[in-house]
Amino acid sequence: MRIYIWLILLNAPPIRTDIYLDLVRQGASPAYSKIRNDTFRTLATDPLFRRRVTENSLTRVLNAVAWKLNDAHEARVNGWQSPPTLSDFGDTPESAYQSRHSFATSARTDASTSEAEQVGYVQGMNVLAAPFLYAARSEVEAFVAFERLITRECPGYVRGSMDGVHKGLKLVDTVLEIVDPKLFAHLMSKGMHAEIYAFASVLTMCACTPPLPEVLQLWDFLFAYGPHLNILCIVAQLILIRDKIIDSPR
């Protein structure tokens, strides 16, 4: 039930299974070696995840998403009306028109986008995809939800420069300074900017922080009210352990 609620909250329409299978049949994407370097260690110490999700399943979903992002980038650069793996992507005629229009607009405005600004596979996407596979009843559902999240909700997180993540980290520092100036000053005195301790939490929307069942409940909240609220959740985690942080001799 959870995955269907997530799909609704993410406004992610279903797709035909054969569309996902076509992406899988394309074989190794340009990012495949990076994906394989990450998948084997994804939530490796979480027995619940390891029992339900196989490495091969995670690899297929990430590789399919990498192909879709690659084709979307080529569409922007070449000005295609509809990239090969995006056509008939389960959309209604109206949404398909909007998709084609957005690609045409992007082609006019973003054709000169540098490699650092391209949306593609980056390290950490494996952890971000993991809860979707854990909650989903099929790879297709996980693929649709994950792809929708990274392309519509937080595309800045998966650009080569990860500019969205770095902006989020600055927000963690800013919010913490407002909410708890003493804790913020203590961390700054130790040289502990959010870039050092909160990078993974921002990038993965706290999926890197066990236990997994609590991550799923957190995501229920984030998808309902906005993934940007993850910044406040990270600060809340710091507040919960503030005494331990301040009393720590290091």
Give residue spans per PLM region.
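Internal, helix-rich recognition cores of eukaryotic regulatory domains
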Residues: 1-250
